[in-house]
Amino acid sequence: MAKITPIEFKVFTKYIFDICGITLKEGKEYLVETRLSPLLEKHGCVSFSEIYYKAKRDKDLEKEIIDAISTNETFFFRDVTPFEVLQHKILPDLIDRRSAARRPSARIPIRILSLGCSTGQEVYSIAFILRTLGLGTDVYDIRVLGVDISNAAIAKASYGVYSDFELSRGLTPAQINQYFLKLDEGRWKIKDEYRWLATFETYNIFDPSRQLGRFDIIFCRNVGIYFSPIDRIKMYEKIAAMLEPDGYLLIGATESLTYDTDRFIPKKYLRAVFYQPNPAKTG
């Protein structure tokens, strides 16, 4: 495996920050080496300097670098608690309010966003819950949007095919048979009734030209940890602008908004913490 020099690492950290906003601090040299070494071999580069200069002239290679660096570990129903609060607190409360406010014969709109959705496991976990609650009927107008900066991750999420190993992380055998169809040895495809609830798009939250609309619920778990404090503030400002006034924000179990923004108020439900817009900071 190729080794990155201190000068190359400094150049690459700025380059990666410029193209996707991810901050790589000193000590993350191993991450760059392990994730980009296969690209060096693929593109016939002998050093990180060589692949850097090649990527500056090749947008496709740049996308491959983004895919490699931004790939995160993910699995179905990761951390469990956010999905419990979604099923037992957030969705029931939201549906009650939307039902009371809807016009006769109008469908009840529910908009959910998964930021940094990676290969789709979080989005499909949400879809499983929606179906469990009986929300896939014509009474509801549901949109679950998963976005990620990685083209490769979005392609896999859209395809909805996972390995035995990927399904075993978070799902029981009964759930696997309920949610998936077996394609062949070791591969499963998500059933259409869940797949149809989800849409996936490539998206960079720091791109000012892209507007996704408004959402009732936003999942942004373990995304801010990759950004600088200044960029985290920018990210949460954008999330605040996308969230409905009575909406919900769910972040990672080890994350906190305390030092990044006062645009949200923490709420507790059993073991879970979720956030809602701060009325004093709206407008």
Give short role names for the model-derived ranges.
Residues 246-253:
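Conserved beta-strand signature within the Rossmann-like core of class I S-adenosyl-L-methionine
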Residues 119-137:
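Conserved SAM-binding loop of SAM-dependent methyltransferases across substrates and taxa
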Residues 1-113:
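Conserved AdoMet
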Residues 109-120, 145:
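Conserved class I S-adenosyl-L-methionine
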Residues 258-283:
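Core SAM-dependent methyltransferase catalytic element
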Residues 233-245:
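A short glycine-rich, Lys/Arg-flanked "PGG" loop and its adjoining helix->strand segment in the class I
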Residues 115, 135-219, 223-227, 231, ...:
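Extended basic-aromatic, gly/pro-enriched interface segments that bind polyanionic ligands
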Residues 86, 218, 243:
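Residue-level signal for inorganic ion chemistry
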